[in-house]
Amino acid sequence: LKTNDIRLFAHNGIYEVLLSTGFGDETNVSPVGLHVRGTDLKIFLYKSTKSYEILVRNPKCGITISFDARKFYMALKGEMNNQVRFSKNGFPFIDGDAVLLAECLPEKDEDPATFKVVPHEAMLNIVEFPAFNRANALLIDALVHLTRLPIEEPHTREALRILLIYELSTAKRLAPELANIVDEIVGQVMKAYKL
């Protein structure tokens, strides 16, 4: 997808983004995987999630691209919901390096449900272009795995445990500024899943 000669998604694949949804006074920000195939953009949401609940009432959404793993963690904890603003056309969004204002239209009524993302406008706020940061990437990947823990079989959880130990310890070693987040995640995971 190109906007103003800047390519937001250079290749096909799954991009971790922050999805902002809103209806009335209710807002939500969730990390989701945006599936990109050419110009076809899709997200998959479980029906038990707040994002799904809001999108079926208001299909307008904001897709925020951010290089900051802390934002993903804060969104996972529900700490970004109060940062949602609405554009003049009623699209909910949070600030980020790039924000895509779009409609998320239901495509398949399964669980997870498939939504087609139809872009309306892009807002580019990049004032500096950050280099690829391995620690942020590992932390975001670990957060994806954490969201899968509740739905995985016990034997798969052991494989995820080994992967999480590697990703979290490496993120902490490479970026000491993320240490408090890593320690908090480790404490929560140990308590919740006895890993």
Predicted regions located by residue number:
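N-terminal structural module
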Residues: 1-60, 64, 70
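Ordered, amphipathic secondary-structure segments that act as subunit-interaction surfaces
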Residues: 58-106, 110
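An accessory alpha-helical subdomain
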Residues: 146-194
